[in-house]
């Protein structure tokens, strides 16, 4: 089998959280294009249904849509159970749902802090362990989490201590699970994107001054595109990455290099 053929995901069942838009939507489309059947999970069920239909029509993937609040353990467990029952297995997952709150630390409320931690870190824990239990029983599986370059550096000029802390936690949680499950057939990795120009970011007028500053600071002088994460995610979800576990892959246009 050639290298291109080995990157195919034919017959695999994969779910993506936060898949109704942005990085999650791009990931789901990539998995489906590579041959996988994909479950589109999001708290926004209308958006998830729309993306599931769009991807199914474009690729022939057997898609389903699932509503899930990743901070609710019972919803996460139900999501994973439904996906495993629908496809008869769970080969890989991309735990991607997340939010950012920009606020000076001295002004951030406990509620704001807790919301960021609950979604970005506890949500990843709940999804990873729920998927992990299925995969451990199978004896195989690949878990991919979304961390961030913000887990490696302190972003400026926007103050976002809660986001930074949550993403640093995702990175070490990923490594911890990778070590625990390494000999049980389950791989766990994360990606750490830099500034990615999703539609939600690029269409917000209030973010234009920040985007200009980010572009000026970055070595490439631009934001990344969701599509520029697709090949890495397909690699991590598939069998060619069989020796890759515990990795935190930074994709930031060299932003963290200085």
Q: Could you say what each language-model-derived stretch is?
A:
Residues 104-105, 112-117, 214:
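Substrate-binding pocket helix/loop in short-chain dehydrogenase/reductase
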Residues 89, 94, 182, 187, ...:
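Short, small/polar-rich loop/turn modules that mediate ligand/substrate recognition or access, typified
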Residues 2-6, 234, 245-258:
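Short C-terminal tail/terminal secondary-structure segment
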Residues 218-229, 240:
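A conserved structural motif in NAD(P)-dependent oxidoreductases
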Residues 128, 166, 174:
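Active-site helix of classical SDR
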Residues 148:
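Residue(s) in the substrate-gating loop at a strand-loop-helix junction
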